[in-house]
Amino acid sequence: MAQNDTVKLIGSWSSPYSLRARVALHLKSVKYEYLDEPDVLKEKSELLLKSNPIHKKVPVLLHGDLSISESLNVVQYVDEAWPSVPSILPSDAYDRASARFWAQYIDDKCFAAVDAVVGAKDDEGKMAAVGKLMECLAILEETFQKSSKGLGFFGGETIGYLDIACSALLGPISVIEAFSGVKFLRQETTPGLIKWAERFRAHEAVKPYMPTVEEVVAFAKQKFNVQ
């Protein structure tokens, strides 16, 4: 597959998973056409259904005649298909395996905890779900402190694979903080993640694509019919 083949990205402005793909493409300076699915939960384009017939979700990267789906898979593909500097995944084999492990932890455990908070039916269920999400974030705080080695990002001095993976949590956490009144990123428990989130949001590869907290909360209120 030639690097200069046509590149398109099917995404949705509100999707934290689409953000992962857009940040990766920006870091690699890949020129692409962005095809937005404004409300992908209600209506999906024929191109999306054709390009990702199994999961029918964004993002989907179209590279020439190829389609690549699932956000972490897209990020890895972008890193390998455009091997120019900067590298998104670590060069060291152990560091690379570790980054993939924690990225999967985020998608499997942390998002499950987010969903549990949102779907809690009573106060007891909500308290249990909140505790689980707090636990996940405490583990990510510890991971950040070890991975960053005192620098600004999980990847060190620059945004890397685990930064991109973790970024998908920021929007959903902002929404459930607004809805539940519970603060999940706290100075006393996650000081590193708080500073990291500020740096990540302000980065030139992120800022053009990441919705503000206000935009995400407003979208969620409209979606769930919450005043």
UniProtKB/Swiss-Prot annotation:
Reaction it catalyzes: RX + glutathione = an S-substituted glutathione + a halide anion + H(+)
- One cellular component GO annotation, for this chain's record? nucleus
**InterPro entries from the UniProt entry:** Glutathione-S-Trfase_C-like, Glutathione-S-Trfase_C_sf, Glutathione_S-Trfase_N, GST_C_Tau, Omega/Tau-like, Thioredoxin-like_sf
Q: Which GO terms describe its molecular function?
A: glutathione transferase activity
Primary localisation category:
cytoplasm
Ranges that cross the membrane: none
| Transferase recorded as keyword | yes
Keywords recorded for this protein, A-Z: Cytoplasm, Detoxification, Phosphoprotein, Stress response, Transferase
- Phosphothreonine found at: T158
Binding-site residues for glutathione, renumbered to this chain: S15, P16, E43, K44, K57, V58, E70, S71
Q: Which domain of life is it from?
A: Eukaryota
Enzyme Commission (EC) number: 2.5.1.18
What job does the chain carry out?
In vitro, possesses glutathione S-transferase activity toward 1-chloro-2,4-dinitrobenzene (CDNB) and benzyl isothiocyanate (BITC). May be involved in the conjugation of reduced glutathione to a wide number of exogenous and endogenous hydrophobic electrophiles and have a detoxification role against certain herbicides.
* Family, as annotated: Belongs to the GST superfamily. Tau family.
Protein name as it appears in the record: Glutathione S-transferase U13
Upper classification of the source organism reads: Eukaryota, Viridiplantae, Streptophyta, Embryophyta, Tracheophyta
Gene name in the database record:
GSTU13
